[in-house]
From Swiss-Prot:
Superkingdom, natural source: Eukaryota
Glycosylation site list: 164-165, 169
TM regions (residue ranges): 10-30, 47-67, 82-102, 132-152, 173-193, 231-251, 263-283
Keyword Lipid biosynthesis: no
Native organism: Papio hamadryas (Hamadryas baboon)
Pfam families linked to this entry: TAS2R (PF05296)
Family of this protein: Belongs to the G-protein coupled receptor T2R family.
Protein name in UniProt: Taste receptor type 2 member 4
Residue spans, topological domain Cytoplasmic: 31-46, 103-131, 194-230, 284-299
Length: 299
């Protein structure tokens, strides 16, 4: 029964992954066309373009890896497994840093805090985006290289995977994976949760203030603020379980967990990327309008 549940979780993760690939490609193409057409692109659209490309390759790699894992009758070498792990770690870390940068940009630009740090960031963050994007990639490359360096000290044993008798022996080298993951993810988690929480608090305060004034309450600016607040709330709902599930997957005792727990972790870990991409589309005016045109929902 648990194997059936786990198989269903794998099928669900493949479907979600496929949806995420389509959504990421859509975000990339729309922002690229905007860039080519107007010969300029905003800071947020530049981040979305980078995020779309990174997520597309990350989810495509995950899909190929899953299909190969399920369909292969042959034993799987440790080198191929290590290649998939390293590429996925780099792409996943890059996409998370892009999301962190996007949330920070939204927080700084939309909130109206008068603290000197916020005012300084508000003036300087947009011009720095072209430099911060490569910095995100370099940080991801550094954490991946750190993983490789640490894994050389305690190398992975031979990893053999069979179709009908799956066996992962990763007791050695797991510490290096956990260390590199925590170094990268903990800072991302703190920045994302802080940015989202500050933005939600600021927008709620702004909306309540406008409700009290009751003059021209619902205008395009307020609608954009409400959309940003919804995006942050739903982002936290997806991101926090994803972070917990991903961390659990990298811990040594994960291999000994029952299939039910593994299935839940797999679903939460897979749901985040496509779910967040869908949220971006339905809360971004230009992406939402283009999606409606494609789906023939425009009145």
């Amino acid at each position: 029964m648990l194997w059936l549940f786990y198989s269903s979780a794998i099928i669900a993760s493949v479907i979600l992954d496929f949806v995420g690939i389509i959504m990421s490609l859509f975000i990339t193409v729309v922002n690229y066309k905007t860039w080519v057409k107007s010969h300029r692109i905003s800071s947020s659209e530049r981040i979305l373009f980078s995020l779309g490309i990174t997520r597309f390759f990350m989810l495509a790699l995950f899909l190929v890896n899953t299909i190969y894992f399920v369909s292969s009758n042959k034993e799987r070498s440790v080198y191929l497994s290590a290649f998939f792990v390293l590429c996925f770690m780099f792409l996943d870390s890059s996409s998370l840093w892009f999301v962190t940068l996007l949330n920070s940009l939204y927080c700084v630009k939309i909130t109206n805090f008068q603290h000197s740090v916020f005012l300084l960031l508000k003036r300087n963050i947009s011009p720095k985006i072209p430099r911060l994007l490569p910095a995100c990639v370099l940080i991801s490359a550094f954490t991946t290289c750190l993983y490789i360096t640490l894994s050389q000290a305690s190398p992975f044993p031979e990893l053999v995977t069979k179709r009908n008798n799956t066996s992962f022996n990763i007791s050695e080298g797991i510490l290096s994976l956990v260390v590199s993951f925590v170094l990268s993810s903990s800072l991302q988690f703190i920045i994302n949760v802080t940015s989202a929480s500050l933005l939600i608090y600021s927008l709620r305060r702004h909306i309540r203030k406008m409700q009290k004034n009751a003059t021209g309450f619902w205008n395009p600016q307020t609608e954009a603020h409400v959309g940003a607040m919804k995006l942050m709330i739903y982002f936290l709902i997806l991101y926090i379980p994803y972070s917990v599930a991903t961390l659990v997957q990298y811990l040594p005792f994960y291999a000994g967990m029952d299939m039910g727990t593994k299935s839940i972790c797999l679903i939460f870990a897979t749901l985040y990327s496509p779910g967040h991409s869908v949220l971006i589309i339905i809360t971004h005016p230009k992406l939402k309008t283009t999606a409606k045109k494609i789906l023939c929902f425009k009145k």
